[in-house]
Design a protein with these regions (language model features):
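Short alpha-helical segments and helix-capping/turn motifs at coil-helix boundaries
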Residues: 1-2, 62-67, 115-119, 154
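Condensing-enzyme catalytic core mediating Claisen C-C bond formation in acyl metabolism
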Residues: 1-48, 148-191
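Conserved beta-ketoacyl condensing-enzyme motif
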Residues: 15, 49-109
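Short beta-strand segments
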Residues: 80-81, 130-136
Length: 195
């Protein structure tokens, strides 16, 4: 350990495969060439935005597994999260895989958190393979946190826009790298109310 928040891994896990899937708007931006799959239909052929988000996670995981030349059955653990109640996008994405699942709830932090926890699990010798995943969908986030699109409210040009995308990383306990050598966990600084 380096100080209180940073962990140095004794056996740094190797990134064996990674993939990302995004929606149309993200594909129109300056990072277009960095994406593995850009879908022109934000429903991803599904009947709801929540199902679309789950479909993105499935696609990202399968692409990452393909790059790692592994099957889902080789995974010892999946660490995944999204912004929906009870992590339903993640839960339904990995349903039927037969892999132990840690559901994480958070926004952008979920990707770093899932990578950190998966790395700790592998470095600790509790498995050989793990996946770290995160997703969000603009439309499902609007419904849950802001103004549901069905409401028809007007958005200002400077309003937040949650990404429609999913990312997955397959980690191996041993491999040719790149490696996750360290992880730093943030502090929450709260001041106790003095009475």
């Amino acid at each position: 350990k380096l100080g209180k928040p940073t962990v140095a891994f004794a056996s740094p896990p190797s990134i064996a495969g990674h993939a990302n899937v995004v929606g149309k708007k993200e594909g129109e931006g300056p990072l277009r060439a960095s994406f593995d799959l850009i879908n022109q239909d934000d429903t991803f052929g599904e009947s709801s935005w929540e199902k679309a988000e789950s479909a993105m996670q499935k696609l990202a995981l399968q692409n990452a597994l393909d790059k790692a030349k592994q099957a889902a059955s080789t995974l010892d653990f999946i660490f995944a999260g999204d912004l929906l109640n009870q992590c339903i996008a993640s839960s339904f994405a990995i349903r039927g895989q037969g892999v132990p699942f840690f559901g994480l709830y958070g926004a952008c932090s979920t990707m770093a958190e899932s990578l950190t926890l998966a790395s700790m699990m592998l470095d600790g010798g509790f498995g050989e393979w793990a996946a770290a995943m995160a997703s969000s969908h603009f439309c499902s986030a609007e419904r849950q946190y802001r103004t549901p699109l069905e409401y028809g409210g007007q958005r200002t040009p400077t309003a937040q826009w949650t990404v429609t995308g999913a990312g997955a990383v397959v980690l191996a306990r041993e491999g040719d790298g790149p490696y996750i050598t360290h992880a730093t966990v943030s502090y929450t600084h709260l001041r106790a109310h003095e009475t």
